[in-house]
């Protein structure tokens, strides 16, 4: 239990499932204070210049969300049980925390920002970051949370707009693990395996290498992405930066929602032409098939945790600045006290980023992509002390090299089904690189 305002509130639920031994996990004594503040400016403009790209955190959509800086605590894990280890660690932190929260809203009090690798055997594993300072906005309400360890809070501060970040200099892009032509050949091979009955769908990703003459400032990327892609969740956690249109799971007071995207077409910039393309996307048997696999996998994963799950009969077309997606919002009422992170673990990897059947598609990805996805297509987001939170899928993103911040890897992927055309899939992947490429070269 921990103190919130003048109330004693139970901390994270304790599922009955067996957890890894927690004896080796240190339990820090965390203290947090949340107060209401006047709106200090656009959230992303408050992020200060720091010693490295991993020192800022953000989760913002249309001006609302959370930003943080500094590190009061951090946790890393790897392996198949990385989600369980992270959940156990956060629960132990919350159990021993002393919190004064004047608002008691989702995202107030102590918050952990997190990102998780796509693959269980990736060395990138899991990272949870608890910033020293968090500023949040929800509607007209704004708040400041300061967090410290061993009863030491950061000194009093008033959030203010920071000097603007600098643009990257002399940005250069080059092929990653595979060239475009090589990746197209991999897609053709995957289609052959699908037509042979090995699987129904596989999501194949590719990467681009980025080199610059200066350190890449995640604040620059965040601000450029937010300006152009206001219908996405703009994020940075531990040097991973992007703008995802796909909410893996949002949990608030027992209601869980998940936005599923699968099926994509590139926009032309001509409104009339784009409306016609949207109509064709909504009728495309190839894209509808791909979308159905993704929706079914999310609904099946949520069902054991919920008393009911609502799945709309047909998807809608989500219009972004550069592409359009088939989208479905799945919702349910959670009855087993699962946290947002536990639900994210149940959903990952969904058919939207892996394929169908998932175990077979996962093996095919390892064989065909010839790279480690790192945290691309893994869960990214935040969780508060109650277990509520928001976890997106790390899409339209890149990872800044912690050893050399002038370097970065960008990622994009496409769902491959029996009707996929390699050249069209390559063009789609190029379109999905556009948000990060444009953000890097906007200066």
Where do the model's predicted regions map?
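Cytosolic ligand/metal-binding cores
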Residues: 2-32, 37, 138-161, 250-329, ...
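An N-terminal JmjN-like helical accessory module and its immediate linker preceding a catalytic domain
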Residues: 2-81
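Non-catalytic accessory segments adjacent to catalytic cores
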Residues: 2-11, 89-209, 305-308, 441
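A residue-level signal for conserved active-site and pocket-lining positions in enzyme catalytic cores
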Residues: 114, 135, 197, 249, ...
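Short beta-strand scaffold segments in enzyme catalytic cores
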Residues: 133-135, 234, 241, 246-248, ...
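Active-site pocket-lining segments that scaffold enzyme catalytic pockets across diverse folds
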Residues: 164-247, 289-294, 298-301, 305, ...
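Conserved hydrophobic core element of enzyme catalytic domains
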Residues: 330-443
């Amino acid at each position: 239990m921990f103190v919130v305002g003048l109330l004693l509130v139970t901390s994270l639920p304790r599922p009955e499932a067996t957890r890894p031994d927690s004896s080796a996990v240190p339990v820090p004594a965390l203290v947090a204070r949340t107060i209401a503040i006047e709106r200090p400016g656009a959230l992303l403009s408050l992020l200060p210049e720091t010693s490295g790209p991993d020192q800022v955190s953000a989760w913002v959509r249309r001006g609302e969300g959370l930003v943080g800086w500094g590190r009061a605590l951090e946790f890393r894990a790897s392996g198949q049980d990385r989600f369980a280890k992270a959940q156990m660690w956060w629960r132990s932190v919350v159990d021993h925390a002393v919190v004064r929260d004047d608002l008691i809203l989702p995202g107030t009090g102590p918050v952990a920002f997190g990102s998780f690798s796509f693959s269980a055997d990736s060395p990138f594993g899991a990272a949870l970051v608890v910033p020293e300072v968090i500023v949040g906005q929800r509607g007209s309400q704004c708040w400041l949370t300061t967090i410290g360890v061993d009863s030491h809070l950061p000194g009093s501060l008033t959030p203010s707009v920071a000097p603007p970040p600098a643009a990257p200099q002399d940005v250069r892009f080059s092929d990653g693990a595979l060239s475009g032509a090589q990746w197209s050949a991999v897609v053709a091979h995957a289609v052959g395996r699908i037509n042979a009955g090995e699987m129904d769908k596989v999501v194949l990703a590719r990467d681009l290498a980025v080199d610059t003459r200066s350190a890449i400032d995640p604040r620059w990327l965040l601000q450029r992405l937010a300006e152009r892609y206001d219908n996405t969740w703009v994020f940075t956690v531990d040097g991973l930066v992007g703008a995802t249109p796909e909410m893996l799971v949002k949990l608030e007071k027992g209601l869980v929602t998940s936005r599923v995207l699968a099926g994509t077409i590139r926009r032309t910039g001509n409104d009339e032409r784009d409306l016609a393309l949207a109509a064709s996307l909504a009728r495309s048997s190839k894209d509808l098939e791909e979308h159905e696999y993704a929706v079914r996998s999310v609904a099946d994963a949520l069902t054991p945790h919920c008393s009911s799950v609502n799945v709309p009969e047909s998807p809608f077309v989500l219009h972004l600045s550069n592409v359009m997606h088939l989208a479905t919002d799945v919702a349910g009422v959670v009855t087993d006290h699962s946290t947002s992170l536990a639900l994210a673990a149940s959903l990952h990897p969904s058919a939207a980023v892996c394929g169908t059947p998932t175990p077979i598609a996962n093996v095919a990805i390892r064989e065909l992509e010839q790279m480690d996805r790192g945290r691309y297509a893994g869960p990214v987001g935040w969780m508060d002390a109650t277990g509520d939170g928001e976890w997106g899928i790390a899409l339209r993103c890149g990872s800044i090299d912690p050893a050399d911040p002038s370097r970065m890897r960008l990622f994009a992927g496409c769902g491959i089904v029996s009707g996929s055309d390699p050249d069209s899939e390559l063009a789609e992947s190029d379109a999905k690189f556009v948000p990060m490429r444009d953000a890097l070269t906007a200066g």
